[in-house]
């Protein structure tokens, strides 16, 4: 793709992300994406062969941003496993306090595509969640947690549950409750 086409491609990806996030993948048309980026539909299809391919590229871009943010978060955490857990759930509560917060876009997308198990976007979402969980395992291992992969899976399960319940109930206290449960889990694993 020509170098001058990159800004157009980035604009398309940014607009598609916003529209998919606000309204859901199935409720957004390629016409709307073209209109939002002020390009013709032909230009849109020159960059992305299909809406499915566009979604895959949007998710890849969001995956990279989210992983970078999570790594930055992890780099700021030092000390005890409890500090890691408390930081994770504190940041989840802060994230959930954003205006018009709607939970994890990756999770919402998988729910939207539940009847399409082979859809490429689902594979990207699976990989995204697995990479975040693996990074948490690395943080826990560096903090001296035994069986860090297993503990990370359990804590990740609590974080996903907290995200879902904060979205359903609009109550950020679920993050603190999940942090308490995760810390109990870590303490009990030391006995």
Predicted features and spans:
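Hydrophobic/aromatic-rich alpha-helical bundle segments in the mid-to-C-terminal region
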Residues: 118-127, 141-185, 189
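Hydrophobic alpha-helical connector segments
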Residues: 57, 71-102, 152-155
């Amino acid at each position: 793709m020509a170098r001058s086409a990159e800004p157009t491609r980035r604009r398309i990806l940014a607009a598609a992300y916003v529209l998919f996030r606000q309204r859901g993948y199935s409720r957004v048309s390629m016409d709307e994406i073209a209109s939002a980026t002020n390009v013709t539909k032909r230009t849109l299809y020159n960059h992305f062969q299909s809406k499915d391919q566009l979604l895959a590229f949007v998710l890849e871009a969001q995956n990279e941003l989210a992983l970078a943010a999570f790594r930055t978060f992890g780099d700021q955490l030092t000390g005890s496993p409890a500090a890691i857990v408390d930081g994770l759930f504190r940041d989840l509560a802060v994230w959930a306090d954003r205006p018009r917060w709607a939970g994890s876009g990756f999770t919402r997308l998988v729910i939207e595509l539940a009847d399409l198990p082979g859809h490429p976007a689902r594979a990207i979402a699976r990989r995204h969640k697995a990479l975040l969980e693996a990074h948490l395992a690395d943080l826990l291992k560096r903090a001296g947690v035994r069986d860090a992969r297993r503990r990370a899976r359990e804590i990740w399960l609590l974080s996903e549950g907290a995200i879902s319940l904060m979205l359903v109930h609009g109550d950020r206290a679920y993050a603190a409750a999940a942090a308490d449960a995760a810390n109990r889990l870590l303490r009990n694993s030391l006995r």
